[in-house]
Amino acid sequence: MNPGFDLSRRNPQEDFELIQRIGSGTYGDVYKARNVNTGELAAIKVIKLEPGEDFAVVQQEIIMMKDCKHPNIVAYFGSYLRRDKLWICMEFCGGGSLQDIYHVTGPLSELQIAYVSRETLQGLYYLHSKGKMHRDIKGANILLTDNGHVKLADFGVSAQITATIAKRKSFIGTPYWMAPEVAAVERKGGYNQLCDLWAVGITAIELAELQPPMFDLHPMRALFLMTKSNFQPPKLKDKLKWSNSFHHFVKMALTKNPKKRPNAEKLLQHPFVTQPLTRSLAIELLDKVNNPDHSTYHDFDDDDPEPLVAVPHRIPSTSRNVREEKTRSEINFGQVKFDPPLRKETEPHHELPDSDGFFDSSEEIYYTARSNLDLQLEYGQGHQSHCFLGGNKSLLKSVEEELHQRGHVAHLEDDEGDDDDSKHSTMKAKVPPPLPPKPKSIFIPQDTHSAEDGNQGTIKRCPSSGSPAKPSHVPPRPPPPRLPPQKPAVLGNGVNSFQLNGERDGSLYQQQSEQRGTNLSRKEKKDVPKPISNGLPPTPKVHMGACFSKVFNGCPLKIHCATSWINPDTRDQYLIFGAEEGIYTLNLNELHETSMEQLFPRRCTWLYVMNNCLLSVSGKASQLYSHNLPGLFDYARQMQKLPVAIPAHKLPDRILPRKFAVSAKIPETKWCQKCCVVRNPYTGHKYLCGALQTSIVLLEWVEPMQKFMLIKHIEFPMPCPLRMFEMLVVPEQEYPLVCVGVSRGRDFNQVVRFETVNPNSTSSWFTESDAPQTSVTHVTQLERDTILVCLDCCIKIVNLQGRLKSSRKLSSELTFDFQIESIVCLQDSVLAFWKHGMQGRSFRSNEVTQEISDNTRIFRLLGSDRVVVLESRPTDNPTANSNLYILAGHENSY
């Protein structure tokens, strides 16, 4: 045993009286105690020693504390070993930890943060001068005494810096406060005491924002992002709230390169901590804890107040008078037939694959335009494509084991089929993706079937001012599946492309049905019973088209958006509506007793369903939310049974534990104007992008966790007003481009030019001031090199370069005789909506295929994701209750 390690064998209760347990540390419980001889208070950590346990860790902590005597270090009193328990006695800090304090007071003031940072740096300067490092600096390990002194505690992970171990090749600490070189210890080869300075910067952000950066991420995901070469050091979110000195202090402490990061002595000379700072700042903080003034602290994730007007939680559909005649449009709704909606190649797939790698959408009122061959290539390869990710997992495994030992019970599941992120993180990129050149116009490679287009690029990059995003040095993604020339995907522009059904004979449907039948027999799928959804009944297998069917009469809600979801347990199909009054749902299996039920009481302007996860822009701050749909429905069902319900949605986040919450805010997404979701057909990755007031957030779907995770936050001055916001997938780029505008083309044969922000790039491309924006109402990427652009009364089908897609079988321009408000792409046509009706025009001939017009009604498309939902109100009373319709009647299968 170390000679400097003295250990008393006497009964510690002869010297100390335990008063109460005040917390649990890394290796044991902590008690408040009183010295029976002197009356002095002490903190005693009681550690139960297990057989075979590594005693060196405990010994290390005792040696560390005994050797350190400094005003900013918790004082060590002595140690006792009694039976199988070790008692470590140390100085008692009555003020508690900063983490406990800010949970009561809210964010610390800038001067209070400066004072705490200075005292912490003084303690670290002392430790580092003695050849030691702390390695776990965070708010929970910075304590205050009753008189406002700052003390560093918890040396359970401290380590001496000796000549033989100048860099610790170990991995211990809390991930969110961890320096990049610590996260990448296996690859970088170690770290030194400068990792403590990084933690000081993270702690400063924690005290200002009540949590460290990336705290919403799984610890393993946070580590993975920190090890990527394009990782950007975090910053304070609110630029205006804090001084330039504070921003610069955080920037210096969070210098990514440890060789350039200032040490404690250097950082103590920063103006942020050299300003006049007295202990009274900490005393004021303690007074606020002891006498909390709830009126002065408002959580900046404050929930919405209850609406002034009571909103019913259950809204029944009004019964139509039997004598009341149908409107002209409702009569036409039952007569005009529509082809199925077109499933875009860049549209995320909501279903989970079955064992054969196919999706069975028999439970949906939806139809795909993609061929079985396309699906085979995509999903058949999808199972094999995971193999390239299988690299060495030693770093993540060691990290996960260490996190588990340190109390992080949650971990990533070892999902062989879906855990892309964890496997990516173990790979070393051989060659980073090439940076694009920096001219005004950027060439984007085209598919070989677009040889007739010119080779001048036209997609422009808008500036990512402030902190341009860097491309990630990640393993190369698998090459996109190549379609055989004789069977290209739908909407291809070659002679061999599938013919879009501009006629009413259903030839395309029959063609694909025959292919499906052949494929199913080959797979022997015919013997497998299909899952059935409890919604509107499917039509017979003879293709008869679909029509609009009324599903609700007299809806009082001010609806913004709509989507649908199928409950995996009951197989019931639900429509989900986002409205001013909240999120509501309608069970299509109960249309005989139609009623809407409220799921979430806050204003909602955008909805999207991914598997069993509902994404929404909700609340008075227009923040992105993630909802667990089964949990949301279960909670709503339980609340209906209670005589008096306490809505969990209204409970503050800290009262309701995260694991019990069915709805959670996605951090860094407040004031979201628009959102879009896209799937990269080259990689299968799915992305969610949000347009905030002055920035863009990019999130990626993580399959094992079934949630979107933030991967990019790009500062960017948004156009005002922001008319359109879509993502465009381009070849050989990891992340999609973000299109924020469309201007008129300038190059030869160029009709439009896409104004984009490139999350993959380290450089900025500035939008030319003399490029006028066009009145674009809709942009959607149908295929890899096929984009539909809606301009006023015209729809143009272009490639990524903005040139018209020329084909003998497809029309590249569709013209309408009204101002287009919204569109839905059908199998054979584009269905355009205007104020008093809708009109469909053939992809092949630009001829009218369907038309419904009723000047007595005002129509509005509420959603076309999975199910087309339409709203209708009387023209002479636009504020009257609305009727709701869906496009239904297609066979629910591939």
Curated annotation (Swiss-Prot):
The modification Phosphoserine is found at residues 329, 398. The keyword Nucleotide-binding applies. PROSITE patterns: CNH, PROTEIN_KINASE_ATP, PROTEIN_KINASE_DOM. It holds the Pfam family CNH. Residues 16-273 form the Protein kinase domain. Residues 508-520 have a biased composition (Polar residues). Residues 340-353 have a biased composition (Basic and acidic residues). Residues 556-867 form the CNH domain. This is Mitogen-activated protein kinase kinase kinase kinase 3. It comes from Mus musculus.
